[in-house]
């Protein structure tokens, strides 16, 4: 395995909104992150992953981006972000950001132009389809519930969204759209960003026929994930993305990718893979209840240990996988791993120590 600059680095996710507020408005900000760089460095952190700080209506906590080139004023200014990059560099630290390019906000200028002219250039940046006999074009359920197709007011057309209706999916089959995305990514990398955590990226390839599927719920809908599982061609899009952006800058990338078979791992995280690494959700999914993370079933330690061990064994000769304990999508890990009576400061420290030891044995490779 070829040695790269990020192999011996420790990464830390910051959710800026709740990290540190320095101006008293109740929202964490870039100044707060800058003020804690020395502390983070002392902890041994090398790479800081920032959850979205782009301009956004915040329907989905910033994962609905209305301007890819602007910092949300709630967090600060572009000048402050550039200061963060410079101060991190002084400490031999690296900044990566969330990259949300499966979809954007319905407030983004592209989508607003598409709505204004459904037959125009920008309509092809998204997926617009006519309904069928007064119904949506197909019976797909979005990840957030409800139909993936949202009616366009005053029209017989619908637009497609796999997440919230305020997050229309971008049409990756359109080369003009891809050029816009690549230009934006390179703009950030040229500023000194070290890379990206790439959100929901496996969803960018669609079956353009959008065929109906057998319902898998009482609502008569079928999970949109089943389309993603069955469609082919995502590798070509991911390789094009890498070659036009990340590969040219030696950027560190973490793909949010689900359900990849062992035979596909080299394509995703091999020496010439699409990404530097991907998240491994196998242990994480053990606590996925019928209604998501908030009704998680009891976790068997043996099953959890086996899931992590198996995931690391399958990639040891291929590349790196990042096991997940918790992230921004669900409750804190301590709420899942500890019973209510044990959720105190001492137990929190002990489980953090356990995680560190466990990570060293089972997660760190090479």
Q: For the regions a protein language model found, what residue spans apply to each?
A:
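Active-site and adjacent substrate-binding regions of carbohydrate-active enzymes
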Residues: 1-366
